[in-house]
């Protein structure tokens, strides 16, 4: 959200955040790091912004929860169980820890993102946060750092946006047509397709129905696919 706001204003955005402890450093199995998402976005001339929005874990924690709710497995290499053994079972992964992406390099990035987002804001590191699900009303005290870089202070907004677009085209043209995507391409396509409707898994719909029933509210009406 904040990265999109920044790029819409013609600036380059860098956003980092911390979370609760769900990720183990490379070589470990105890969850002491957060998924520590990192977003970098840059406006592009005549195109959508070039934006990378990623968790520093091998897979986003939300995707692990979605796999559990759908009764599906997660990819190999995403997580280990409490015993440190690799697992593709999302429930075991939640009880254990997620892996960082990219081995020791991703692990280093995860640590540095946490240092930036927590240390500069006097927030807690993931391992020191309060579990708000077990302690409702408590403050988790995660940290967030939002940086906006104005290209006008460098080579100028127009020239920067043109350079960014050149990079997008170079990436897209590096393989067979339609087979290589620049950062942000899949998300832009998905946002366009979801502008009027959002597709939900049957298990998610069932959970929503149960919630609305419990609250005594009319169930949401599903649109035809």
Model-based region annotation:
Residues 61-122, 139:
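Small-residue-enriched flexible segments
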Residues 1-25, 30-32:
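Long, hydrophobic, well-ordered secondary-structure blocks that form the structural core
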Residues 14-17, 41-43, 52-55, 148, ...:
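Short beta-strand segments
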Residues 21-91:
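Phosphate/diphosphate-binding glycine-rich loops and adjacent basic-rich segments that engage nucleotide
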Residues 8-12, 34-37, 45-49, 73-76, ...:
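Short coil/turn connectors at secondary-structure junctions
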Residues 11-22, 116-132:
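Glycine-rich phosphate/pyrophosphate-binding loops
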Residues 120, 125-225:
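Catalytic-core signal marking the mid-to-C-terminal active-site face
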